[in-house]
Amino acid sequence: MKKPIVVGSVAYDPKIVTIWDIIRDYFNDNGVRLDYVLFSNYEAQIEYLLSGKIDIAWNTNVAWVRTYELSNHKAQALLMRDTDIDFKSVFITKAKSGIKSVQDLKGKKFGLGSADSAQAAILPLKYLQNELDESIKDVEIVKFNSDLGKHGDTGRSEFDVLEAIKNDKLDAGAIGISTWVRVLEEGLFPAGEIESFYTSEGYCHCNFTALNSLDEKVKKTFVDMMLSQDPNEPIIKKMMQMEGLNKWVITTEKELKGYDVLTQAMKEQNLIKNNW
């Protein structure tokens, strides 16, 4: 019996078990053995991928950059969600704060999410530095390191930032675009109470990562099976809704450029080392 393709994923939410049971069953029902291993944090998952204990890792952008750099660029991004493309960070403030641009943050308190979150901390800090240069010293940075190891997947630190803004403990803060859309669509804050004043350029988020050494047939089989999923099939539709995508897409050179800004930021902030 052939060995299964072993995929790693971080269990940031109980729904992850359901998502991966559906994917595993889909593969197995179609004649391809697949199993998954759940991790409590991305640092452990990176270690297992680099040491060959798993074949493929469902990685955040931070985990991808670390894997790529620590493998001496001998890793490959295979596949991603359509929603991982053109992801953005948003700066939020109270509507009546008088803050209309990043320049208005001088002398203010600005909140960042978990230190290992690309969308809520790593990239926002870089954007602040780009916009303010030396004047960043005039901004009081407040960090909310909730759920470290999950790379911002839970979104908890972003809601900590929002609550602090609501309760006047912060003047402004950074969150990911998906959290901001959720706030607006679900009416999580009174209408007109908070607003955005800065939206970053688009960048890429998660991807399925494999080392170059993984058999090409295994890579192709995995990608082909994922792409063959029919989003109109009820069980697949359920999985995709839970995972937050409309379709899987192959990661090309164009998408890889969407990790350049994060790679630069992580190097500048000394975040490449994998501290597990």
What residue spans do the PLM features occupy?
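Beta->alpha turn/N-cap motifs
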Residues: 38-42, 52-71, 174-181
